[in-house]
Each structure stands twice: as structure tokens, then as C-alpha cells.
């Protein structure tokens, strides 16, 4: 009898341990399919080197590489853009950008280069805008002028998230250019209850991902174009606060969004689909009460590809395509604010099969993750004297 039990135990493969993390806030919530949460822990085999490229940035939020290898960086609290050289030298703050509202979670957010930047010099940025009755997310474009007096010229606001709301939280604000030249804009639901419920309201931009043309007009093939009572810029809806988004090798959009207490999500937003917030989710209110009816599934609402409980507080996403670290090919790298980690996900057939937490020993809140032209990852740390970190192989 004992021999039979021992043989059975030997024959049964043990479940691999997940990444070390705290207990779930809502242990009664169960995943909808295997590996939807707490996937097997994996470990990068390539020895890594972490280099501080630049320091002294005022709460940096977004980063984009210029063709010459310099970096365009936003400073959230300073409401400014800077150009940072590979040696860490910082330009003066660019002039010409509109004023921002820096209260709460507001300020200067993401930056992106136009697909035709090499000829047009056009850049895009998102920011919190003061308005009558509250605030909202805005997206502007202009021509970048470098040199001794760096500035932005011909500035034009091309998009404003509507409606205006008396809130200083959950702006979203990531900018991602699609392969066809259209621009994805992520928009938070503003956190407070009057905004949260609008994530399911197609007359509102709150809690949505928008898809617009570079001039701010709406693409004719957006999913809700021509439908009465619906904002035509909407691509997908039912989102909470998306501060991480990127395209994969096939040009598909992925996003990682913040949950409440538990329930951060990885999603692949498709045209016209509903991602559930606040009707379904895998977290609870900060008070410990359930969100709505406490549902994790509902008809017509998409399941997250992956979720975290406890949260990582995701901000910034890069999907690795470089050659510097071959074992990372196709892996997802997510900035973790609350988790103070660079979170690595290994996917197979659009399902997560492994997770790793990198840089945890540093204790940095990571705000953005960008793959550089050299195949290294460049990170922004979220503090009043923020850094640009380079994560690359120890041996070039």
C-alpha cells in the first residue's frame, strides 16, 4: 500500500511553483483556464548588466528613441519634454508645449514619434488638461526642433477625451502607432464612480481605447463608425486604467491595465470588444468590498489573457524583438510600480506559460519600458529624481 502510494507520487508531475508573491486578495476567485494567473516561474539565463544612463528626471513617464539614438523623455510633474543623450546629458526642457494639470495623477504623459518622423519631425504626446468643470486627457502633435534651444513648433491638439470629469486620477494616456499609421490612445475611467460606470457606455470615451488618424480624424473602418449614439473613435471598451500598451511582431495590440486591489490584467484588445470593467474583474475594492456583484465572468465580455492578484501596478510594455538577448525573443516586459519589478512574461499561442520578476533588489518603481535600437531594454523609474536604466547582456 505504501509502495503504491509512493509510486503514484513519483509518477505524478509536481506543479511548478509560481513567482514569489503575496497571498491573493480574493482567493475565492478562480481562473477561467489554466495559467490565467500565477504561471510557472522562469529565470533568464543570460547574465544581465544594469546601467544608469541618466538621473535627475522629474517623475519621467514616457520615452521614445530618436533616429540618432537620443531619447525624447516626458517629465510628468515638470510638465515638460526633454532630449536625453546616450551619455546621460539632458537638454533644456522643450518650450512650446501646452500647459498641463499636474494635480493628483495628472501631468505630462506619453511620447511617440510619427511614423514619418524622419521627414516631418512630428512628435505626439499626451497630457492632463485643465477644463471648465474638471480635467481630461488630451493628445497633441507638433514639430520637434532640436539644437541649442529645443522646442516644439506648430502645436495642435488633435484629440480630447470626453466627457470632462471632476477627477484627477486614471487618465490612461499610452500612445501606440499601428502598422497602418493610425494611433491607439488608451483612456482611463477616471477612478471615481461617475466615471467608472462609463467604461460600459459607448457614448463616453472613459475606460476605452481609441483609434484615430494622426490628424485626429476617425478611421472609416473603426468598429463603431456609423452607429448612432456611439463615439466613433472607440476601438475597445470596458477598461479600467491602461498605462501599458504595445504591438507584437504581427502588429496586434496588447495592453496591461491596472485593477483595483487585485485584478491587474493582460489583454489583447480587438475591435469592438468589451473587456468587462466594472462588471467583471479579478479584484476587489480598496475597502475590501466586492466590485459590483463580484463577478469574474459574464456573457459578451472578454476574459483577460492573464491577471495578477496581488497587483503589480503595470505601467509600460515592451514586446521584445531584439537580438541582444535571444532567449527573450517575443517575451513581454511590463513595468511594475507597486511590485517594484520588471515583469517578464513568456507566452505560447497567446497564453502565458512563464513569469519572472527582474530588478526586484533595486526597489525602483518602473514607469515605462522601451526596447532600444541596440536590443537592450530602457526603463524609466518613477520618482522625483527619476532615472533611465539600461538592461542588457553583461557581455556585449
Whereabouts are the PLM-identified features?
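Repeat-solenoid scaffold signature
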Residues: 230-270
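Conserved blade-ending motifs and adjacent loop-strand segments that build the rim/top face
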Residues: 239, 352-373
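Internal metal/ion-chelating core segments
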Residues: 175, 182-195, 199-236
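Acidic, Gly/Ser/Thr-rich repeat motifs that build Ca2+-stabilized beta-propeller blades
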Residues: 17-193, 244-247, 252-255, 259, ...
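Surface-exposed loop and turn segments in beta-propeller and other repeat-based domains
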Residues: 92-106, 154-171, 214-235, 278-309, ...
Amino acid at each position: 500500500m505504501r509502495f503504491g502510494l509512493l509510486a503514484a507520487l513519483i509518477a505524478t508531475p509536481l506543479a511548478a511553483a509560481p513567482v514569489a508573491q503575496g497571498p491573493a486578495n480574493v482567493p475565492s476567485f478562480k481562473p477561467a483556464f489554466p495559467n490565467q494567473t500565477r504561471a510557472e516561474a522562469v529565470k533568464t539565463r543570460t547574465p544581465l548588466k544594469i546601467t544608469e544612463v541618466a538621473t535627475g528626471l522629474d517623475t519621467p513617464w514616457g520615452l521614445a528613441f530618436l533616429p540618432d539614438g537620443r531619447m525624447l523623455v516626458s517629465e510628468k510633474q515638470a510638465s515638460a519634454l526633454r532630449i536625453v543623450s546616450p551619455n546621460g546629458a539632458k537638454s533644456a526642457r522643450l518650450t512650446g508645449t501646452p500647459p498641463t494639470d499636474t494635480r493628483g495623477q495628472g501631468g505630462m504623459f506619453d511620447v511617440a514619434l510619427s511614423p514619418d518622423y524622419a521627414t516631418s519631425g512630428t512628435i505626439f504626446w499626451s497630457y492632463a488638461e485643465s477644463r471648465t468643470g474638471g480635467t481630461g486627457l488630451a493628445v497633441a502633435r507638433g514639430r520637434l526642433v532640436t539644437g541649442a534651444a529645443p522646442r516644439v513648433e506648430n502645436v495642435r491638439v488633435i484629440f480630447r477625451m470626453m466627457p470632462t470629469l471632476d477627477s484627477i486620477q486614471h487618465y490612461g494616456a499610452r500612445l501606440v502607432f499601428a502598422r497602418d499609421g493610425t494611433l491607439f490612445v488608451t483612456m482611463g475611467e477616471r477612478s471615481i464612480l461617475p466615471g467608472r460606470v462609463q467604461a460600459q457606455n459607448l457614448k463616453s470615451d472613459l475606460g476605452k481605447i481609441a483609434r484615430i488618424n494622426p490628424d485626429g480624424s476617425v478611421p472609416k473602418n473603426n468598429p463603431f463608425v456609423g452607429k448612432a449614439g456611439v463615439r466613433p473613435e472607440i476601438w475597445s471598451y470596458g477598461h479600467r486604467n491602461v498605462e501599458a500598451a504595445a504591438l507584437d511582431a504581427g502588429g496586434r495590440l496588447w495592453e496591461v491595465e491596472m485593477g483595483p486591489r487585485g485584478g491587474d490584467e493582460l489583454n489583447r484588445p480587438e475591435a469592438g470588444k468589451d473587456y468587462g470593467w466594472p462588471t467583471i474583474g479579478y479584484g476587489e475594492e480598496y475597502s475590501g468590498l466586492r466590485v459590483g456583484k463580484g463577478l469574474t465572468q459574464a456573457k459578451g465580455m472578454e476574459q483577460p489573457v492573464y491577471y495578477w492578484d496581488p497587483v503589480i501596478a503595470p505601467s509600460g510594455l515592451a514586446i521584445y524583438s531584439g537580438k541582444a538577448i535571444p532567449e527573450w525573443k517575443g517575451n513581454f516586459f511590463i513595468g511594475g510600480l507597486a511590485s517594484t519589478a520588471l515583469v517578464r512574461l513568456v507566452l505560447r499561442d497567446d497564453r502565458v506559460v512563464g513569469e519572472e520578476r527582474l530588478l526586484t533588489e533595486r526597489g525602483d518603481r518602473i514607469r515605462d519600458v522601451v526596447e532600444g535600437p541596440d536590443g537592450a531594454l530602457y526603463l524609466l523609474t518613477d520618482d522625483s529624481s527619476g532615472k533611465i536604466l539600461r538592461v542588457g547582456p553583461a557581455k556585449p
